Amino acid sequence: MKAVIFAYHDMGCQGVQAVLDAGYEIAAIFTHADNPAENTFFGSVSRQAAELGIPVYAPDNVNHPIWVDRIAELAPDIIFSFYYRNLLSEEILHLAPAGAFNLHGSLLPAYRGRAPLNWVLVNGESETGVTLHRMVKRADAGEIVASQRVAIAQDDVALTLHHKLCQAARQLLNSILPTMKCGDIPSVPQRESDSTYYGRRRPEDGLIDWHKPVSTVHNLVRAVAAPWPGAFSYNGSQKFTIWSSRMCPDAQGALPGSVISVSPLRVACADGALEIITGQAGDDITVQGSQLAQTLGLVAGARLNRPPATSGKRRIRVLILGVNGFIGNHLTERLLNEENYEVYGMDIGSNAISRFLLHPRFHFVEGDISIHSEWIEYHVKKCDVVLPLVAIATPIEYTRNPLRVFELDFEENLRIIRYCVKYRKRVVFPSTSEVYGMCTDASFDEDKSNLIVGPVNKPRWIYSVSKQLLDRVIWAYGEKEGLRFTLFRPFNWMGPRLDSLNAARIGSSRAITQLILNLVEGTPIKLIDGGQQKRCFTDIRDGIEALFRIIVNDGDRCDGKIINIGNPDNEASIQELATLLLDSFDKHPLRCHFPPFAGFQVVESRSYYGKGYQDVAHRKPSIDNARRCLGWEPSIAMRDTVEETLDFFLRSVDIAERAS
């Protein structure tokens, strides 16, 4: 049986040798060129392949059509991936008749994603393992062929566990590969309900929070011990790394981060103390704990701190147009929680951002983007990242005011995009899930799904096509003139400050706000065309975290990307949303201050939205791009979002005024 192998790291070396030992013919091996900035403590697949006389390649993009064609010419019967760092396209996965199979360093479906070796230690697990699974479009989600468990000892650190996993992988492959070679390939579906997903870890994730339990801090030390970058803290401006530690139960009443003693070197955590066995000050040599205390000048009672503010480094300036809107005000809060961001904003009102107006890193001007073009151009030039969030995005306005939707959503925003091109500024643009229109795919893929809208005489599509056209213009500017951009597509984000009850009174709001108004005023909840349309509702906190990671843009992985941001697990019909909202309303402590429930009322969309409206039966996102580029996974259940949104609006109502 002829195999093509994608491999890297020690696991890659183990996999290549196991495939050879099982009697497969290896037609070619694809690997990665080593990164000079990375600590390459592991074996070299390219060297191994060269010594074995096997053709080996390290393309920048193995999914490029040229490489897909070359792999097809190799005519593999089977494909293996052993710690290859890039996802393989469906075109490659379909080249091998027997299938494509990946070795993953956890017991799937737990710990899908990046760095499972480190994450299991961070989380204090007592067991992990390796899994061979069939590769499908979604990372780590295919049927399981075989797995092998590995016990995690209390004294295991990242490197010792790595060696255990390599040994387990070799045993697993030696056992299953001969069977697969004979055509007998076991297949057990993964239980999605048991799946967990983790993103990549960065060196800065090793920063210790002394307010955490001692077990959490100790597990972090274990998880990133050498040859990984290490867990670290600061004494003043001096950074130091902790390479090994042990837990002590008694913090002697000291505040978290306080040095309890210097010989041995012990530091208080939330519920105990961490004894530092070995560590390193800056780029100095590794020494034992008491010597580290001397090097750092530590004494009992000293307080360790978070990294000092770097006055020499300019903060990242973010321009948010539409800063008072739903996304804008929540994003502002997230950015201001980080020391290295400064926010400049414009909007026609300030009610939602009044809590930030005195913040020293928030600069607001009340104005209209269609009027204050000079201010906007100046601040595009001044800032680093631009988010043009101004848009008319309420469905009833698409049929009421289609020309105004086009003028604001397309024409005014196009001018801002051109400023970004002119001054070479990065733009993070809010596309919309509406661009998929009546797409028939089970889940909407940013890079493959067709964008399908209705006829011209249905003006409800003016918003969708305005956004889609601007998406295409931005993409073209990126391709032809080097514009740095990311398009993000929110899928039904919900939470506090979504629209207002006053907007709902004139029909100019999103669904949940309109439903809450019906409950507050004791009017029937209107179910448009029966309310069977399904949407995937996403908590604003989940959405904003993803958007924040797009702005951070770690490793420039979001450049030139389109990213859906939604929660596929929170799919529900509008009727189901209304029922859940009613249940939460009846349980709310303020329920007694509002009228009785007036029931549900089914209405036709034409009578509600007017002539020219069409609805969409379902709208579910694929979030593979978000997982891959952001290391992001939504986590907040729909019920929690509904309850928090309802609570916000009920507490905003003047109860005394209602009673009078």
Swiss-Prot record:
Dehydrogenase ArnADH, as annotated region: 314-660
InterPro entries: Arna-like_SDR_e (IPR045869), Bifun_polymyxin_resist_ArnA (IPR021168), Epimerase_deHydtase (IPR001509), Formyl_trans_C (IPR005793), Formyl_transf_N (IPR002376), Formyl_transf_N_sf (IPR036477), Formyl_transferase-like_C_sf (IPR011034), Lipid_A_modif_metabolic_enz (IPR050177)
Keywords: Antibiotic resistance, Lipid A biosynthesis, Lipid biosynthesis, Lipid metabolism, Lipopolysaccharide biosynthesis, Multifunctional enzyme, NAD, Oxidoreductase, Transferase
Binding of NAD(+), residues: D347, D368, I369
Sites where the protein binds (6R)-10-formyltetrahydrofolate: R114, V136, K137, R138, A139, D140
Protein induction: Induced by BasR.
Catalytic site positions: H104 (proton donor), E434 (proton acceptor), R619 (proton donor)
CDD domains associated with the record: Arna_FMT_C, Arna_like_SDR_e
Any single Pfam family the record assigns to this protein: Epimerase
EC number: 2.1.2.13, 1.1.1.305
Protein name: Bifunctional polymyxin resistance protein ArnA
Organism: Salmonella typhimurium (strain LT2 / SGSC1412 / ATCC 700720)
Taxonomic lineage of the native organism: Bacteria, Pseudomonadati, Pseudomonadota, Gammaproteobacteria, Enterobacterales
Gene behind this protein: arnA
